[in-house]
Amino acid sequence: MRIFPLLACCFALSVAAEENFGNLVFSDTFDRKETQKVKDEPGNGWKTSSSWSAKGNKEVDLVDGTMYIYIHPEAIHAVDVGHDFQFIDGTATMRFKFHEAKDTLMLNFADLTLKEVHAGHLCAATFGSKKVTLQDMKTGGMLLKYYDARKAGKLSKEDAEVIKTKVKTIPADISVGEWHSLNVTILGDTMTASVDGKSIGSFSSPGIAHESKQVLRLLVSNKVTLDDVKYYRKK
């Protein structure tokens, strides 16, 4: 078996793919240690929600060169671990591992200066063991007129139908307890998700094309371990 030429070919294809993503603007391999184990201390510019969503309890650990994110029993919101990522078109890549079948990982793109939507939500790709969901939040469920109406129990059937058109759910089979890789690419009004080098699907909607994406928030509903996070800006 001629293994080395095959490995060289795979490496070349990987490099070519990364070059096509654009300029690398952020990366993290989590090869560092925390100074304590009481509060979140992810470092490298990461910000977490635990101070307000989990009464300050720790929800992020750096373990053996990875970032382990887990929700605290007292939490009132999914764990939110965010980092600046300013772009119009770009790609986020990372390795991830689910620990239980119910685990989910959401890549939530946001512009906190945008006041027409709740908490700056623009669009998101959510990965679960059985499905991947692509969503336009800016013109969908997080648009304040919809968000406030739903919260008040006054969302009309017509508006509920509109919101449904802003979400695409795609069946997937992502194993638990094993490492996987993911890519989420945004080009114009289209978001594409891939797992382990295979395209899961794409979704096009106006809110995805928002031209002032500022932050990428990683939201975890239960437990997820991450490594090799990279953000690329194409435009």
Predicted regions and their residues:
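Hydrophobic h-region of N-terminal signal peptides that target proteins for export
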Residues: A8-A17
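Extracellular carbohydrate-recognition regions
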Residues: E18-K47
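Short tryptophan-centered beta-strand motifs in secreted/extracellular beta-sheet-rich domains
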Residues: F30, M94, E178-I186, M191-A193
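Short carbohydrate-recognition loop motifs
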Residues: G56-I76
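Secretory/extracellular carbohydrate-interaction modules
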Residues: Y70-A152
